[in-house]
UniProtKB/Swiss-Prot annotation:
It comes from Pseudomonas syringae pv. tomato (strain ATCC BAA-871 / DC3000). Belongs to the DNA gyrase inhibitor YacG family. One of its GO terms (biological process) is regulation of DNA-templated transcription. Transmembrane segments: none annotated. Inhibits all the catalytic activities of DNA gyrase by preventing its interaction with DNA. Acts by binding directly to the C-terminal domain of GyrB, which probably disrupts DNA binding by the gyrase. Residues 47-69 are annotated as: Disordered. This is DNA gyrase inhibitor YacG. Binds 1 zinc ion. Interacts with GyrB. InterPro entries: DNA_gyrase_inhibitor_YacG, Znf_NHR/GATA. Keywords: Metal-binding, Zinc. It comes from the Bacteria. PANTHER family: DNA GYRASE INHIBITOR YACG.
Amino acid sequence: MSQPMTVQCPTCDTPVEWSAASPSRPFCSERCKLIDLGAWASEEHAIPVSPDAEDEMFSGDLEAPHRGH
């Protein structure tokens, strides 16, 4: 039988078996899962986006309102 795959907990680096026996995977525990969620909620973690892409994404939202005079 092969060894089960293990991954490192993203919060504390503890080895975690990737199986149904580890319901919080990839985290080692519910505590580490909540610590990570809190970091995303407080914007300690972010997905990098180039400033140009962000400007392009929201440029349509900033159009001046049409005035019918």
